[in-house]
Amino acid sequence: AGAGIGFLGSAWLLALYRLFSYNGKRQLARHIIEGVASRVQLPEGGRGLDVGCGSGALSIAAAKRNPKAAFLGVDRWGQDYASFSQALCEDNARAEGVRNVRFLRADARQLPFPDESFDLVTSNYVYHNIPGDRQALLRESLRVLRKGGRFVIHDIFSRHIYGDMQAFLQSLQDEGYTEVRLIPTADGLFVKRSEAKWMMIADSALLIGIK
């Protein structure tokens, strides 16, 4: 029985890898990244922050779409995702010919920036991987967002991970945030319902709004 479970687990991981591979037929990761990046809009001279940038894919895609703005991708990198690094991000940016992006080691739980440092904050499938209070992580990212700045955060916003997100959205609105909403992305927007169910990302959504 144990061997059977192990085989099924390996098969699931292989199928997941093929689905998300940039070189595969479906290229789901690329589709999601471009979907998030398409909602990232910065004014000329604006500053954008990508929290938990990993390989730099979202930072680079967003920077390409906003050539007159500057993007910063931050991540802890390290053992959990050993294949990702600051050097890899920089290499990927060079390969894409993108010069308006740079990368820095930083922790999403305590970002090394003053309040209201950025015009936009974005992220893709990051906070659910960090143990602890995920709403507090969101608050930390919003702390560095300037008044009038936009946030575009994509993650798995299930109740057991994030708690009551409707109450969180209401609290933001009560504080003066505008156009705050959760947009489901696993209903065909980024991911097919059938894919999302077996990948266990059915609660994927974009958290967007203006501070």
Tell where the protein language model's regions lie, with residue ranges:
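Class I SAM-dependent methyltransferase Rossmann-like catalytic core
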Residues: L13-G35
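A short glycine-rich, Lys/Arg-flanked "PGG" loop and its adjoining helix->strand segment in the class I
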Residues: Q135-K147
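A short acidic, Gly/Pro-enriched loop at the edge of an enzyme's catalytic core
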Residues: R109-V121
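Conserved beta-strand signature within the Rossmann-like core of class I S-adenosyl-L-methionine
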Residues: G148-D155
